UniProtKB/Swiss-Prot annotation:
It holds the Pfam family Ycf4. This is Photosystem I assembly protein Ycf4. GO terms for cellular component: chloroplast thylakoid membrane; photosystem I. PANTHER family: PHOTOSYSTEM I ASSEMBLY PROTEIN YCF4, PTHR33288. The chain crosses the membrane at residues 21-43, 63-85. Keywords: Chloroplast, Membrane, Photosynthesis, Plastid, Thylakoid, Transmembrane, Transmembrane helix. It is a multi-pass membrane protein. The lineage of its organism: Eukaryota, Viridiplantae, Streptophyta, Embryophyta, Tracheophyta.
Length: 185
């Protein structure tokens, strides 16, 4: 979602609360729970859930391995659910031409650096960069080059949904708004 006026451009970023993350967190949780229940059932020697027959599975080595995969999957699933809950990666980019200030804000993982807030002057922006990598896993990333701070990504590095036309359009609009050149690399 974008909000734009003559002097201010605000772009909100979605973060980790994407449909695909919800899908994979659910699938991983249910699958690993199934593995753990089958491993536990093989240890106890009786079916905990009638849908998952486990009397033919010996506890050693199959039940141990399934329990291990179940526990590992639950840890990974809990990590995904935590990133969704904390909405890691969400935030906004705010460009204010009137005051000449750019603010970039992102939510991170809990701790000292949970809030990532970058603030700098517009006159320090050297260019808008587009990185294009084609092939099996195409990548199109929009960066902002800042004097003294290097390059800062403006789009998610795992976002593959931008077509070349969309990324060019976005870069052109932003470069026009900021009055800086565009570089492609």
């Amino acid at each position: 979602m974008n909000w734009r006026s003559e002097h201010i451009w605000v772009e909100l970023l979605k973060g980790s609360r994407k449909r695909s993350n919800f899908f994979w967190a659910c699938i991983l949780f249910l699958g690993s729970l199934g593995f753990l229940l089958v491993g536990t059932s093989s240890y106890l020697g009786k079916n905990i859930i009638s849908i998952l027959p486990s009397q033919e599975i010996l506890f050693f080595p199959q039940g141990v391995v399934m329990s291990f995969y179940g526990i590992a999957g639950l840890f990974i699933s809990s990590y995904l659910w935590c990133t969704i809950l904390w909405n890691v990666g969400s935030g906004y980019d705010r460009f204010d031409r009137k005051e000449g200030i750019v603010c970039i804000f992102r939510w991170g993982f809990p701790g000292i650096k949970r809030r990532v807030f970058l603030r700098f002057l517009m006159r320090d922006i050297q260019s808008i960069r587009i990185q294009v990598k084609e092939g099996l896993y195409p990548r199109r990333i929009l960066y902002m080059e800042i004097r003294g701070q290097g390059i800062i990504p403006l789009t998610r590095t795992d976002d593959k949904f931008f077509t070349p036309r969309e990324i060019e359009q976005k870069a052109a609009e932003l470069a026009y708004f900021l009055r800086v050149p565009i570089e492609v690399f």
